[in-house]
């Protein structure tokens, strides 16, 4: 009976994973347009989560009730043997003590699960203490990142951690969905619109440049790939290491398309996602010659692809579909892609003929050199910004960050500890700051109320207080500590973590992040059970 229950719950878990990784990013109701895209995706996520988690919860409750009924007679006999009330009290005390000890041991062994559950508990506590009523539970319209959604994300993590098991096929299906999304977006850049996503919009409309594939605007797209691109790269590296040539080529092409889209989508955050994930990939493969060379070929393909897509858009006259005030137009028109591709190929050739010891020295030198170059770029950028108005930085992200910090400082003790309530950022700051979170008085965003700080940590500080920030940080810290040997998880934590500094939680990134963490937790448990077994289904890359 127990085995049948486990098998059934594994099937439910795999259906849930397929819905989140495959269906959710591709889901689009024709005719709904740009502004209903977020709503439709959230309702799909909420309904699928409630159904799958509800089924699992009912099955578990039935199993617990049956177990209690079976042990009922044994417990009655134990109580009948008690000689007096004192002995019964001692029995209860011993039971509580042993249970407490077991819980402490369990929490130590499952530190990531504990941290995720604490994050969910902080969300519930914040919502219970919130003066903003239903908003704290359901969230703001079009965002829906209230306590209910956070609890569903925690539930998704727990479901995957317990029952995801061997799930490589679903991960590859998720990769297929990811590259399909990228291909639709790249076709849009060339003027093709296979799904009619841009129907009704013309050149000059804000939606014309911001409706990116089936994901929405560039912030949503970058958030999605901050989770899925590390998974895609991990699957590619695994195929290369296992010398599966066909899979390596397919996954290499897939990742190349994703990199091109991230460079053309218009947000600096997307370029950062691609750069951080690729650098992490090169760093993790610094001791692996074949993998390093495969990654150089991937980078070469991305450079050639950028050149071809730029020329294609120029010849078809579709440059107007790129964001006019973003980085995409400069990257698409840059003439140095061919030279950069040649440098990558030359480096790959030199690397190939060197002795193994010199290869490793060269790889380490290039990696540290890239770090020095990145640090120099950051320092140059900071010096360049001196004297400018910080409030205008990042399309007025600077002003949002200032607002968030002012709101936190003005809050009372309850506000500082528990926050205003999940997704109550706009409601709280609208009360304590003159003008609320309205940033623009003209243009497309004139009068728009911003519901987050475009920084997950500052948003969490306002919504869930210091306790929420500590719990959220604990998720990252414990995951990095426990899964530090897992290549995919390291990339996921760094890429998503970096992007979270300039972006926000939404239905296309946060649920997927917790789901992949749950899969890593399941893989860690399988590794403990089968230390000497090389499981083909494992996604871990040492």
PLM feature spans:
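Membrane-interfacial, low-structure loops and terminal tails that flank and connect transmembrane helices
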Residues: 2-6, 67-110, 243-246, 320-324, ...
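Alpha-helical transmembrane segments of multi-pass inner-membrane proteins
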Residues: 4-25, 49-60, 120-128, 146-158, ...
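N-terminal hydrophobic segments of proteins, predominantly signal-anchor/transmembrane helices
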Residues: 16-32, 53-151, 180
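Short, hydrophobic transmembrane alpha-helix segments
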Residues: 28-42
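Membrane-interface coil-to-helix junctions
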Residues: 40-43, 47, 111, 119, ...
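Membrane-interface helix caps and helix-loop-helix hairpins in membrane proteins
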Residues: 135-140, 263-266, 501-508
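Aromatic-rich transmembrane-lumenal/periplasmic boundary elements in polytopic membrane proteins
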Residues: 143, 184-200, 377-431
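Interfacial juxtamembrane loops and adjacent helix segments
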Residues: 194-212, 414-462
